[in-house]
């Protein structure tokens, strides 16, 4: 089949939305409920545009369409940002390495791609200031000749950005570099170069785009899948044309038609699946690639300084970045199959750890057990069907219009989602003869962007009695909407904080966020831990601890039965286990079949174990642990204790045998496992009990 393809590399015309234009666009003070959105999808006779896909690109297309006064609909078969858009490196960047290739190969297309991305970077930082910020990134230099080489490249990056350069790059001496990044490897270090890019909370950014779309009057619904495309015969040409989609509400199973003059395919890695609904025999254009990231404790990087390894052992680029008080490291680039549930592979996790160790000081031991979460995102790389080499990967994105009028936007990257959306709508308007004005999304504030200031968290503390850390978190997550979340917070019953019960003690997420998440179209517990909060991406164990309370809160609000609650809990745990690296973390215990502890270590750990196993049964249960903890004044509910023991209970018989405990301590000693709750609890209990033991006359030296 012949394809109409347009490759885009030119940056969009930058022109901010003026006040008069914004006044013309209707804006809803209250978000319609999901049920109201589904009703709108079913009752509207015909939309101008139906977008399939609720990631960054699809949501961006919907925002561009609705702000041009087009009657707009969007459906997403999972949750908004459930795919690639929530699994990025969290950078808003132009692409330093693309610029390097452009200069080295005199490639104008690469140069224009970087220029476009730098324009879009500036806009994205402006329209969602609460979710994004400039981040300095250090490029350490270990050979003298590399210093002028890298400096020239980074300066060119600044020059291409022009007036939208975030901050000017600069060179650091070895001493200053180590002062700013103390964990850096000192040996042979000659200095460093620091440049600036943007960083954001990707899933929340995606959600903010989608919520802004809803505010402007579009009908959008998550958990609504396309079963098949609708077609009708064009009376003028006699050809079949796409005129909508037959959809199914994944939650209720209800099916209905959504009719539209134009259908846009913005399904990322699933691009070809929807294209084949239109033309079954069409060749694939998507070549999926998996990118794995890991999260390790925040103390491995400075609070406000990232690190770039420009040349890994296999020629890739690795970023090492502070994010949400943790440290992200990644990414990999491996061909993969398209799946809705990508799993981070152990070899990719170990590759990233190996590269990180290469750049950090030898006395900073990065252990496998330090990995708190890991994920894999599928990049939807695309081929250009018009190219002579049909296997060559297109370095940017493509817009494709099929013979039946299905518009497909594929490829690209997070930073350029807005310009991609603008170009897609321009093509859709042209092909389908839609009546619409120019794009209005440059400078258009996203959900929460209005009324946000860097100091608004102080008002949250003063007006509501929230902890400072919680107030800062709410401000940086919800922006101007943070006050709505604070109003929903329950009284703690403590002197301070007055309101805001945390879901888990070490993270600033509070219970009212779960209730607010439902207003933001969260339908499952996974939506809350993965995309409304980011707990699942930061620490899988903490997310696992928070799940029972999250399910309880959602169940009460949504009227879930006990059976539904159990199913939700199980599904969310499965998500953590498979997609967020909990499986790999757990396997560090089971893989350590050979115990290599020394005899003194074995005796020490046996002694610790028997402080809980008073009857010398050879195993301990929640009752044993609860009894000891109560004795030293620590109270943990039985459900939480069951979860703690279950992490170590390898044969899943409801108890922890001595051998299982020794395997745990063996893994802890080798750095295979860290932050294990049972290990920490038992050590704390042992120390507390030892302090209480009476000192014998012999040990006191005799006398009275």
Predicted segments with their positions:
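N-terminal Rossmann-like FAD-binding beta1-loop-alpha1 element of flavoenzymes
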Residues: 47-74
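Core beta-strand elements of the Rossmann-like FAD/NAD(P) dinucleotide-binding domain
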Residues: 45-47, 251-262
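A conserved short coil-to-beta-strand element within the FAD-binding core of flavoproteins
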Residues: 222-243
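C-terminal accessory subdomains/tails of enzymes that are appended
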Residues: 78, 131, 138, 142-155, ...
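Glycine-rich FAD pyrophosphate-binding loop
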Residues: 66-88
């Amino acid at each position: 089949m012949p394809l109409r393809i347009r490759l885009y590399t030119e940056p969009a015309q930058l022109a901010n939305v003026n006040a008069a234009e914004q006044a013309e666009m209707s804006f809803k003070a209250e978000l319609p409920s999901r049920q109201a959105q589904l009703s709108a999808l079913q009752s509207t006779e015909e939309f101008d545009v139906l977008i399939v896909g609720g990631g960054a690109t699809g949501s961006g297309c919907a925002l561009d369409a609705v702000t041009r006064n087009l009657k707009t609909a969007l459906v997403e078969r999972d949750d908004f940002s459930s795919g690639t858009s929530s699994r990025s490196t969290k950078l808003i960047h132009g692409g330093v390495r693309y610029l390097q290739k452009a200069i080295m190969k005199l490639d104008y297309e690469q140069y224009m791609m970087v220029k476009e991305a730098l324009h879009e970077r500036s806009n994205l930082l402006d329209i969602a200031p609460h979710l994004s910020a400039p981040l300095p990134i250090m490029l350490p230099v270990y050979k003298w000749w590399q210093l002028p080489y890298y400096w020239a490249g980074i300066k060119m990056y600044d020059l291409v950005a022009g007036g939208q350069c975030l901050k000017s790059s600069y060179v650091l001496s070895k001493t200053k570099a180590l002062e700013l990044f103390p964990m850096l490897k000192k040996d042979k270090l000659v200095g460093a170069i620091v440049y600036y890019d943007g960083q954001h909370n990707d899933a929340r950014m995606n959600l903010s785009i989608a919520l802004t779309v809803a505010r402007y009057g579009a009908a959008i619904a998550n958990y609504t899948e396309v079963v098949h495309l609708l077609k009708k015969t064009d009376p003028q040409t006699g050809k079949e044309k796409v005129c909508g989609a037959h959809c199914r509400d994944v939650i209720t199973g209800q099916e209905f038609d959504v009719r539209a003059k134009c259908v846009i395919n913005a399904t990322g890695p699933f691009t070809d699946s929807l294209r084949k609904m239109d033309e079954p025999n069409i060749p694939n254009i998507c070549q999926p690639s998996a990118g794995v990231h890991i999260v390790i404790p925040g103390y491995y990087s400075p609070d406000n300084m990232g690190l770039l390894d420009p040349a890994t052992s296999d020629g890739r680029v690795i970023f090492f970045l502070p994010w949400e008080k943790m440290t992200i490291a990644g990414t990999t680039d491996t061909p993969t199959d398209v799946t809705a549930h990508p799993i981070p592979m152990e070899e990719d996790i170990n590759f990233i750890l190996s590269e990180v160790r290469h750049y950090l000081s030898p006395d900073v031991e990065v252990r496998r057990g330090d990995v708190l979460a890991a994920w894999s995102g599928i990049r939807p790389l695309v081929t250009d069907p018009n190219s002579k080499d049909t296997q060559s990967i297109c370095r940017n994105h493509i817009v494709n219009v099929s013979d039946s009028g299905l518009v497909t936007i594929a490829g690209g990257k997070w930073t350029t989602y807005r310009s991609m959306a603008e170009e897609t709508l321009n093509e859709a308007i042209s092909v389908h003869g839609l009546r619409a004005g120019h794009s209005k999304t440059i400078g258009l504030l996203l959900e929460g962007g209005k009324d946000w200031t860097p100091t608004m968290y102080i008002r949250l503390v003063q007006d509501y009695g929230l902890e400072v850390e919680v107030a800062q978190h709410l401000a940086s997550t919800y922006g101007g909407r943070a006050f709505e979340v604070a109003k929903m917070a329950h009284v703690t019953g403590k002197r301070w904080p007055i309101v805001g019960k945390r879901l888990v003690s070490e993270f600033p997420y509070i219970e009212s966020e779960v209730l607010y998440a439902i207003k933001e179209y969260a339908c499952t517990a996974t939506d809350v831990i993965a995309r409304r909060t980011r707990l699942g991406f930061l620490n899988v164990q903490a997310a696992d601890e928070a799940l029972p309370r999250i399910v309880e809160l959602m169940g009460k609000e949504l009227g879930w039965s006990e059976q539904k609650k159990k199913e939700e809990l199980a599904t969310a745990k499965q998500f953590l286990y498979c997609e967020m690296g909990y499986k790999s973390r757990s396997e560090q215990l089971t893989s350590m079949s050979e115990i290599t502890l020394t005899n003194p270590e074995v005796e020490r750990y046996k002694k610790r174990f028997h402080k809980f196993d008073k009857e010398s049964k050879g195993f301990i249960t929640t009752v044993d642990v609860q009894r000891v903890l109560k004795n030293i004044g620590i109270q943990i509910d039985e459900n939480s204790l069951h979860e703690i023991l279950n992490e170590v209970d390898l044969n899943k018989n409801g108890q922890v045998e001595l051998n299982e405990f020794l395997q745990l301590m063996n893994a802890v000693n080798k750095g295979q496992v860290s932050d294990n709750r049972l290990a920490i609890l038992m050590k704390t209990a042992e120390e507390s009990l030892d302090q209480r033991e009476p000192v014998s006359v012999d040990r006191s030296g005799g006398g009275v």
